[in-house]
């Protein structure tokens, strides 16, 4: 099945502590989760590693968020939207269901 949300898509969070926030998808995991820039930030206690030059301390990083808790953001309407697929010139393309525009 083709992915409705892909890397570099702008998404909006529908549920959870970051509800209403927008961000770009930086990674799509095979478990049905996404890593979105600036969303679902957690603090991680990192051990120092002198060989890699990594200083120890508390680091803030993005944790995966369930794909069902986000929706793709349609910049034309300014709202969350659903994605459909259709064939144009023999290629499968994604489009927004609300206004039938192609997803970048």
From Swiss-Prot:
GO MF term list: rRNA binding; structural constituent of ribosome
PANTHER family: MITOCHONDRIAL RIBOSOMAL PROTEIN L24
Protein name: Large ribosomal subunit protein uL24
GO BP, one annotated term: translation
Pfam families hit by this protein: KOW (PF00467), ribosomal_L24 (PF17136)
Keyword tRNA-binding appears in the UniProt entry: no
UniProt keyword list: Ribonucleoprotein, Ribosomal protein, RNA-binding, rRNA-binding
Assembly notes: Part of the 50S ribosomal subunit.
GO cellular component term of the entry, any: ribonucleoprotein complex
Family indicated by similarity: Belongs to the universal ribosomal protein uL24 family.
UniProt keyword ATP-binding present: no
InterPro entries hit by this protein: KOW (IPR005824), Rib_uL2_dom2 (IPR014722), Ribosomal_uL24 (IPR003256), Ribosomal_uL24_KOW (IPR041988), Translation_prot_SH3-like_sf (IPR008991)
Function: One of two assembly initiator proteins, it binds directly to the 5'-end of the 23S rRNA, where it nucleates assembly of the 50S subunit. One of the proteins that surrounds the polypeptide exit tunnel on the outside of the subunit.
NCBIfam families from the UniProt entry: rplX_bact
